[in-house]
Amino acid sequence: MPASAIFMPQRARRNNMDYFYEHESELFTFYRVPKVLFTEEPFKNMNCEAKLLYGLLLDKMGLSRKSGWFYKQGRAFVYYGISHIMEDLGCAHNKAEKLLSELEQAGLLRRKRQGLGKPSMLYPLKFENRIS
C-alpha cells in the first residue's frame, strides 16, 4: 500500500480515527500558555502544572475585564478559589497551594488574602521583566 493511502479519510474511519478537516480545526477553544515559560530562565524549570495554572489565570483575566474586576490603580485581578483550582487541575488541596506558591516565587502571581472565608484576590503578573 502506498504511504499516501495511510492518510486517506476512509482508512482513518476504518481504524476508528478521524482527522480534522479544513474549518474543523477551529472548533474548540484553547487555553494559552506563554512559550517563555518553557524556554526562558527563570521559568523553564518550573512545574508544568504551575505553568498550566498560569495559563488558566491569564484566561480568567478576560472575565475580570468583562466583570470590571480592577483594584487600586486599575490592576486586574481574578477570583479563583482553591476548590476550583483543585477541580480544574484534578489535584489535592496541598498541590493547588503548592502551585500557587510556585507562581508567587517565580514572580508571576501576587495573592491578596481577604479573610472571612472569602477567596483571595489573585493578581497574575507580567513575565517580561522576569526573563534573564
Feature locations, PLM:
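Short recognition helix of helix-turn-helix/winged-helix DNA-binding domains
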Residues: M1-S83
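Winged helix-turn-helix DNA-binding recognition segment
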Residues: A3-A5, E22, K60-P124
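Generic beta-structure capping elements
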Residues: L56, L125-F127
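Short, amphipathic alpha-helical interaction segments positioned at domain boundaries
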Residues: E128-S132
